[in-house]
Curated annotation (Swiss-Prot):
Residues 435-471 are annotated as: Disordered. This is Trigger factor. It comes from Brucella abortus (strain 2308). Belongs to the FKBP-type PPIase family. Tig subfamily. GO terms for cellular component: cytoplasm. Residues 169-254 form the PPIase FKBP-type domain. InterPro entries: PPIase_dom_sf, PPIase_FKBP_dom, Trig_fac, Trigger_fac_C, Trigger_fac_C_sf, Trigger_fac_ribosome-bd_bac, Trigger_fac_ribosome-bd_sf, Trigger_fact/SurA_dom_sf. The gene is tig. It is found in: Cytoplasm. Pfam families: FKBP_C, Trigger_C, Trigger_N. GO terms for molecular function: peptidyl-prolyl cis-trans isomerase activity; protein folding chaperone; ribosome binding.
Length: 471
C-alpha cells in the first residue's frame, strides 16, 4: 500500500492511497485458498474444489470484501502511523467510474482512493492556577423556606362555597369559550374549570377580570396572549373569552402541621421544611455553578486561540441553528421581530459554534492531561436517566443506546466536562461572595446582550446551555 500526502494546509489533510493490483491478488489468493478447504460444492470432494472454479464463483464478492476491509482499516492505520487524530471520520473519495471499479474487482487495476480529514489541533495546556472566579452564595432564610412550604401546602387547602363576589385567592368554577376575531379557537374552551384568583394559572389579565363576579354571572373579557406564548397561532394575539361563573368559593385557613405534610407524602412538617430547604439549595447551587462555569470558560476563551476543525464547527452551528429556528417558529416570530437579520444571526451563532468547539477541545485536553475519567457506574446512571425520560419506550431506548456508540458518547461528554470543571475548581482561585436571591437570579448583562437574535430569555439561552457552553 502506497500512502502519499497530497494536501497539508492548516488542519486539512488529504492522503492518496494506492493498493497495487498485485497486493489485492495476493489477498484474494489467500482467501480463496482458505475457502477451498471449507467449500462444499456439488460435484467436488470436500477440500478438492479447484481454485479457478472458486475464483469464478466467488472472486468478485471476495475482492469486494477485501476492498471494504482496506477502507475500514486504512483510516485507523494511516492516522496511527502519522500520529494524528482526526476531528471527524475521514471522508473516503473513490473514482465513480464503474468500469474502473470493475477492473479493481477483477484484479486488473490498482485500487486508488483518497482520505480527506481535519486533524485535531495540538493544544498545550497552560497554567490555569491563576484563574480567579467569584462564586455567589445565598443565605437561605427561614422565611424563604416557610414561604415555599406554604406555596406547596396550598395544594391541600380546602375551599367553602360563598354567596358573595369573588375576591383575590378565592376559587372560581367557570365555563369559558375563547375566540379570535369572533371565531372559537382550538384549545380555548373548557367547562367546570377551577381557578384560584391570583395564582397566575391563566395568562396575564384573565384572572383579574373575574374579581367581583358572583355565581351565575356572565361576562366577556378581552386579553392579549404574551408574545412568547407557546402556541404560535395565539402568540401576541388579542382574544375574547365568554365567561360563565358557576361557583365562588373562599379558602379555608391553611394549617401547617404534620397532617398537612402527610397529605403531601412527607412524614412531618419538620421533614417537609428540610426537603424544601434542600430543594432551594439545589436550585441556587445550579445557578451558582453555571455562573462560575461561565467565568471559567470566559477565562479559558481568552487564553486559548487556535484554528478549529471546520467540520466540527459546521456540525455545532447546524445544531444551534436548528434550535434557533425551532424556537422562533414556536414563538411565531422572525429575525426582524428580534431587531436583526438572518445574515447577522448566522454570523453571531457561527462565532458561538466556534467558541463551543474550541472550549470543548481545551476542556478535553485538560481532562486528558489530568487523568479525568468517566466511570462505568456514572455512564450507566446517565443511560438509566435517559431511558427514564421516555416512559413506555424504555426497552426501545435502551436497545438503541446499546447498539449506538455515538449516542452513548453523547451521554458521556457532559459527565466528562463537569468532572473537568470540578478539577479546575479545585485548582483555581475561588472567592465566595454573599448575594441576595435577586442578585443571584438576575440575568447576566453580557448574556443578555449576546442573546440577540431569537429571544434573549429563550432561544439564545437554550443555545448557550448546550454542550461545553453554559456561558
Amino acid at each position: 500500500m502506497q500512502v502519499t500526502e497530497t494536501l497539508n494546509e492548516g488542519l486539512k489533510r488529504e492522503i492518496k492511497v494506492v493498493v497495487p493490483a498485485g497486493d489485492l491478488e495476493a489477498k484474494l489468493a489467500e482467501r480463496l485458498e482458505t475457502a477451498r478447504g471449507r467449500a462444499r460444492i456439488n460435484g467436488f470432494r470436500p477440500g478438492k474444489v479447484p481454485t479457478a472454479h472458486l475464483r469464478k464463483m466467488y472472486g468478485k464478492s471476495f475482492m469486494a470484501e477485501i476492498v471494504n476491509e482496506i477502507l475500514n482499516d486504512s483510516s485507523r492505520s494511516i492516522l496511527a502511523e502519522r500520529n494524528e487524530k482526526s476531528a471527524t471520520q475521514p471522508e473516503v473519495i473513490m473514482s465513480e467510474d464503474e468500469k474502473e471499479a470493475e477492473k479493481v474487482l477483477d484484479g486488473k487495476a490498482d485500487f486508488v482512493f483518497s482520505l480527506n480529514y481535519e486533524v485535531l489541533p495540538a493544544i498545550e495546556v497552560k497554567d490555569f492556577s491563576k484563574i480567579a472566579v467569584t462564586r455567589e452564595v445565598v443565605d437561605i432564610s427561614d422565611e424563604e423556606v416557610d414561604e415555599q412550604v406554604k406555596r406547596i401546602a396550598s395544594s391541600t387547602r380546602t375551599f367553602e362555597t360563598k354567596k358573595g363576589k369573588a375576591e383575590n385567592e378565592d376559587r372560581v368554577t367557570i365555563d369559558y369559550l375563547g375566540k379570535l376575531d369572533g371565531e372559537p379557537f382550538e384549545g380555548g374552551a373548557d367547562n367546570d374549570a377551577q381557578l384560584v384568583l391570583g395564582s397566575g394559572q391563566f395568562i396575564p389579565g384573565f384572572e383579574e377580570q373575574l374579581i367581583g363576579l358572583k355565581a351565575g354571572d356572565e361576562k366577556v373579557i378581552t386579553v392579549t396572549f404574551p408574545a412568547e406564548y407557546g402556541a404560535a397561532h395565539l402568540a401576541g394575539k388579542e382574544a375574547t373569552f365568554d365567561i360563565k361563573v358557576k361557583e365562588v368559593a373562599k379558602p379555608n385557613e391553611l394549617v401547617l402541621d404534620d397532617e398537612t405534610a402527610k397529605k403531601l407524602g412527607i412524614e412531618s412538617l419538620e421533614r417537609l421544611r428540610q426537603v424544601v430547604r434542600e430543594q432551594i439549595e439545589s436550585q441556587y447551587g445550579q445557578i451558582t455553578r453555571q455562573k462560575v462555569k461561565r467565568q471559567i470558560l470566559d477565562a479559558l476563551d481568552g487564553d486559548y486561540q487556535f484554528e478549529t476543525p471546520q467540520k466540527l464547527v459546521d456540525a455545532e452551528f447546524n445544531n444551534i441553528w436548528q434550535q434557533i429556528n425551532f424556537d422562533l417558529q414556536q414563538a411565531g416570530r422572525t429575525f426582524e421581530d428580534e431587531e436583526t437579520t438572518e445574515e447577522a444571526a448566522r454570523e453571531e451563532y457561527r462565532k458561538l459554534a466556534e467558541r463551543r468547539v474550541r472550549l470543548g477541545l481545551v476542556l478535553s485536553e485538560i481532562g486528558e492531561k489530568a487523568g479525568v475519567e468517566v466511570t462505568e457506574e456514572e455512564l450507566q446512571r446517565a443511560v438509566y436517566d435517559q431511558v427514564r425520560r421516555y416512559p413506555g419506550q424504555e426497552k426501545e431506548i435502551y436497545d438503541f443506546l446499546r447498539r449506538t456508540p455515538d449516542a452513548v458518547a453523547n451521554l458521556r461528554a457532559p459527565i466528562f466536562e463537569e468532572k473537568v470543571v470540578d478539577h479546575l475548581l479545585a485548582n483555581i482561585n475561588v472567592t465566595d461572595k454573599k448575594v441576595s436571591k435577586e442578585e443571584l437570579t438576575a440575568e447576566d448583562e453580557d448574556a443578555a446582550s449576546e442573546a440577540k437574535p431569537a429571544k434573549k430569555a429563550a432561544a439564545k439561552k437554550k443555545a448557550e446551555e448546550g454542550k461545553s457552553e453554559e456561558a
